Amino acid sequence: DSILLGIGMTPLDLMLQVFAKKDDPFSGGRTYYSHPSLKDEDKPKIIHQSSATGMQAIPTTGVAMGIQYRELQGLAEDFGGKNPVVVCSLGDASCTEGEVSEALQMAALKQYPIVYLVQDNGWDISANAAETRAQDMTKYMRGFNGVEVKTIDGTDFDLCYQTMQEVFDTVRKERRPFVVHAKVPLLGHHTSGVRKEWYRDDLEEAATRDPYPKLLQ
């Protein structure tokens, strides 16, 4: 939601999808909430996605492949000197899925202009990291030669903003893939049907890493 608000969507836009209203700007009330797709002229484009965890990695990497192809063939549009960058937003647990491995393999091999933004809150719906993966996902992603990985404190707004600006600038100029791994707390519920109180004993610790009070200091 924060990314959507950051690109210019309004809280009303998001609530229209939650309540499946016909004026929902993403799908006219047809898709599940938090499943945006967008083709507004004045905003970044968001391709449609399904609910399968991690599946967004392949189509977004495909978009980056298409951008590279157009550039190599001399067919690319002029965006005022700013080369386009594709962003794939992922959760840390989704990085265990096969689709993510396939996407990273091709992005590394072909050097696509894409940024994989991984929000790592240490949880996979209701299972913690130790129950779902053998290692920190950055160790796995660093195994793909040609993909640069940066790990940051995702609760530090200034650091996040600066890092993403630097990464975007590099990808626009050098046309190569990045992974930005942001360590964040899980503050809310996964969904209204999977409530945090049922399975978590780290709520007080997570609250100490809430980025909102830090931003207001």
Predicted regions and their residues:
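Cofactor-binding active-site loop characterized by glycine-rich and histidine/acidic residues
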Residues: 1-110, 128-138, 142-146
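Electropositive phosphate-/nucleotide-binding environments in soluble metabolic enzymes
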Residues: 5, 9, 53, 154-161, ...
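Short internal beta-strands
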Residues: 111, 116-119
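Glycine/aspartate-rich loop-and-adjacent alpha/beta segment that forms the canonical ThDP
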Residues: 14, 170-217
